[in-house]
């Protein structure tokens, strides 16, 4: 069992703040297990709507749920979409003190229904597969190769892990997509998903993908929306502003789980991964996902110009601008692109995430940071803030702050 304290803390805060908490994420990422651990020490009623006895208990949902107190957990809520309106009525009652934790199989419609029907009453907590802040950085290569899905990461061997991921892909195509009410032949979606794996880390170009697969732009867009809506693909949005430069305005596409990326590319071990032309892109996507899990910035972007300047990850908090570059190199160096990003975006600092062992500075504003030390990256933000504040204290006084995403750690 791998502890997941960060997500348990997020759930605890969300349940205190909101009458309804929605725990969302891809299938098989551990939502039910996390909910049971969270509910273990509380007065809890648990409903699993894939269980016929539990469905029978909810034949009159308003009467049943209205009589309960404490925490009520409803798993696979998409099996009874009428419950959304019932929950809205119940939590709007002045005397309501019940808290609801709802879980559902990843679905664009699920998130849409929850957001629309329960607007102002629900808080989302997004669960990912295991990250390095949970497994320990000593297992970084295992998480990178196998991905973060619990059964894939914990498999006895790389071969068993790959077999599980292949099974996940087959089940998603043959069962999960039809259960979403979507009619797409599994071979067609498999071809698209595999092609997307080859485009991992590149900007989205529907026309190019459509030509490769002999599909219309509209069709490939709908396929992408399915994978993004089920938390399997990340569309990293571009940052652009009036800089006097032609900037990229299409999103970058990443398969969120590196293990699924490697399965789709038929990369079974590190030898084949290290010899593959998508090695650098795989590293980039893996690093980005780990950073987003650890820092959880309110918003994250990439930035690029048509002349070649870019930064892989860019975010702003309380007026400070930060950049991340991901380089699969033992000796990363300052590039013209990095200097352009520092100047154009007015970055407070830029980090280069690399596979080496030790952190070190390349300049006052650029640091090299190892993946095996990535969980300590938040301390670097604290250090920067403290030194900035000391410097500013010599001039006009400024108010001390803790950036928003640090409050989530």
Question: Which residues does each predicted region cover?
Answer:
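Hydrophobic anchor at the beta1->P-loop junction of P-loop NTPases
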Residues: 23
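Conserved catalytic/switch belt of AAA+ P-loop NTPases
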Residues: 85-102, 116
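Accessory nucleic acid-recognition modules appended to NTPase machines
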Residues: 158, 163-318
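Domain-level recognition of nuclease-like catalytic cores that cleave nucleotide substrates
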Residues: 357-390, 400, 405-409
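Short regulatory helix/loop adjacent to the ATP-binding pocket of P-loop NTPases
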Residues: 108-122
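Pre-Walker A adenine-sensing motif
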Residues: 2-14
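Conserved lysine of the Walker
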Residues: 31
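Hydrophobic positions on the alpha1 helix immediately C-terminal to the Walker A/P-loop
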Residues: 34
